[in-house]
Amino acid sequence: MFRATAIIRADKVIDAVPAGHAVLERDERHLRRKAIVLEGGEKVLVDFAEPIVLEHGDRLVLDDGREIEIRAASEELYEIRGRDPLHIAELTWHIGNRHLAAQIESDRIFILRDHVIKAMLEGLGATVTDVTAIFSPLRGAYSGGHSHDDHDHHHGHHEHDHEHHHHHHD
């Protein structure tokens, strides 16, 4: 089994022809150490130091230098539309308040299907439609800024040449 320890983000890909493809749903694209199956049946061990979210078009770099392209699988979603931008903002707030993953666009929101949430959104006046599409939700504010872009694995620390002032309150 080949091993992948580096990633090239989709917007940094130079080589147009990957050695293979893996089609993964949104939950499967959030990983740290996991074996994934390529379209041809070959297995690859993804082995990162920290959890990462793979996006459609990203490439995994194998230990032999080959690249595997990640393709987002189509998933069963709800497309949510509001009456106007303010209504969409209100609907987005209710979705976020329930800690649901959401793909937010200027005139609509996508979430994974859940009949209870659908009823709530319709009760709030939303138009909710069943769709099948690639799901690329926003990453949370606390998802971390660390990435493995451009094969960067440096985890060093830098020196501080300034003082740290700590204020303690009793």
UniProtKB/Swiss-Prot annotation:
Residues 144-170 are annotated as: Disordered. It is found in: Cytoplasm. Keywords: Chaperone, Cytoplasm, Nickel. It comes from the Bacteria. One of its GO terms (molecular function) is nickel cation binding. Pfam families: UreE_C, UreE_N. This is Urease accessory protein UreE. The gene is ureE.
